Amino acid sequence: MKLFTDIISNDEMCSDGYEMKLVEDVVYEVDAAKIVVSDGDVDIGANPSAEEAAEALENGAEQVINIVHSFRLQSTQFDKKSYLAYLKGYMKSVKAKLAESNPDRVPAFEKGAAAFAKKIVGSFNDWEFFTGESMDPEGMVALLNYREDGVTPYLVFWKDGLRETKI
């Protein structure tokens, strides 16, 4: 199993225990699911029936996104202007780290990141934003959106902002 941590904050962001797809060689799209949790519950990956989910919610449980819950990602807010200001600084930090570790990757990162950033801005109101557990303002902000069905959540993580560790 591989664990992916933010190269800036060192927060654990996701793992390959979830279905991951590399998109345009710049971001990972990671399929998520809504789960119901209550105090003391542990997510073992089972999919409860709708009746069980409704019953659990009646007993004070809450519905959460599995990856957000498992990696203790923290919800944060941006307007378009503040997100673009954050993204500019974040991309500069990632580029600097990349220049040290893999300088040949820098041009592809810059081109891919700029193109994907345009997609984010084009559908800005569809996205939700999450930081790592430490809430480091310099660290990665993961993006949450929903598939075309309007029900299935997925998260987007910047490929070059993650460090892969085998566990």
Swiss-Prot record:
State where it is primarily located. Answer: cytoplasm
Q: Which Pfam families match?
A: TCTP
Q: Which GO terms describe its molecular function?
A: calcium ion binding
Residue ranges of domain TCTP in the record: 1-167
Gene3D superfamilies (alphabetical): Metal Binding Protein, Guanine Nucleotide Exchange Factor, Chain A (2.170.150.10)
The record describes the protein's role as:
Involved in protein synthesis. Involved in microtubule stabilization.
**Under which name does UniProt file this protein?**
Translationally-controlled tumor protein homolog
